[in-house]
Amino acid sequence: MSFMGIEGKGGYHGTVIEEILPVTFANCDDRVECPQGIYFSQKPERHPILNGMPETWPMVLGYNKAFAKPDAEVIVSYDGAPILALGTYKKGRTLAFATDIAPHWCSKEFCEDPCYEVLWKNIVYYLAGELG
């Protein structure tokens, strides 16, 4: 999902969707365009979601600016912004990935890298309670 997106039209601010996610949103256009490409940093103590991921990921071209909730675990960030944040809601796990999962901000280099498949498999297993 695009968080607030173009002109803030995502409409998640103040909704149950925002309530269950480990991040909050500004009530405005939250896109951060990075046409030069950026590389994310991950915490030194690797979370199981990051198993099989390289230390430096292929570049992305932008992200949605979000704010980690106090109880969120941010495992990937860029310039202080949470890119991959984890949380819980009732009996389940939640996750926010603040960039694209398809070609646009997710560069062709990233989409075609073997780590892309590894990341998404790990995320699905984590959310299903089968990892970590």
Language-model-detected regions and their locations in the chain:
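A glycine-centered loop/beta-turn motif at secondary-structure junctions
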Residues: M1-F3, E7-Y12, V16-I17, K65-G132
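An acidic, glycine-rich "communication" segment
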Residues: F3-A81
